[in-house]
């Protein structure tokens, strides 16, 4: 009876495809509906899923706005290029205290022998360029997350990591806690 919150297509996928369908039929998990831009409250915490463009062959892809008693965050671990989204990321960042955003790849060429244009994620260098007009205070809200094993930001001593931090952005590490 573990609650699993899912958008409509993901719920259908879990119900109709093994081995996940067994979890549903045996009631190991109980699907709870999520809807685009519909807020769910959990005590002092509220969560609002919103659709973002990304691979959708099986399910929707969503980001989340999370509101706590004192602070707020956006969480966007997966998205296509920012230009594919109808929302202005810089303006959205101004409305929250923390912005945890997709940093799958640092830059083009990170996957040798693979056409990176076919792997839809914003590069960290693109995200920084998009957000360079923000004040340092606003850039300090940004936490790069969801890094591929090839991403040089995983090495805290890399020149790329130092460059990101020198521009006022943050690189999330395992175990980080951001108080809401």
Model-derived features with residue positions:
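Active-site HxH/HxHxD metal-binding segment of metal-dependent hydrolases
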Residues: 1-24
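Short, charged/polar "capping" segments at the starts of alpha-helices
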Residues: 9-16, 151-154, 179
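Short, solvent-exposed loop/turn segments at secondary-structure junctions
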Residues: 11, 54, 105-106
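A short helix-to-beta-strand connector/capping loop
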Residues: 24-30, 43-45, 165-168
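Cap/insert and terminal regions of metallo-dependent hydrolase folds
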Residues: 70-72, 80-176
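Core dinuclear metal-dependent hydrolase active-site scaffold
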Residues: 31-92, 176-180
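Residue-level recognition of the N-termini of beta-strands and the immediately preceding loop/turn
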Residues: 1-3, 27-29, 139-142
């Amino acid at each position: 009876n573990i609650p699993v919150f899912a958008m409509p297509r993901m719920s259908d996928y879990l119900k109709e495809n093994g081995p996940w369908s067994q979890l549903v039929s045996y009631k190991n998990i109980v699907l709870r509906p999520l809807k685009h831009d519909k807020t769910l409250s959990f005590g002092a915490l509220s969560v609002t899923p919103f659709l973002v463009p990304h691979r959708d062959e099986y399910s929707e892809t969503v980001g989340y706005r999370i509101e706590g008693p004192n602070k707020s965050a956006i969480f966007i671990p997966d998205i296509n290029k920012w230009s594919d989204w109808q929302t202005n990321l810089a303006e959205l960042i101004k409305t929250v205290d923390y912005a945890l955003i997709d940093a799958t790849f640092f830059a083009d060429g990170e996957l040798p022998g693979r056409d990176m244009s076919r792997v839809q994620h914003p590069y960290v260098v693109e995200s920084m360029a998009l957000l360079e007009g923000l004040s340092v205070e606003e850039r300090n809200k940004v936490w790069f997350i969801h890094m591929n094993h090839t991403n040089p930001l995983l090495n805290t001593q890399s020149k790329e990591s130092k460059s990101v931090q020198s521009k006022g952005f943050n690189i999330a590490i395992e175990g980080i806690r951001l108080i809401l």
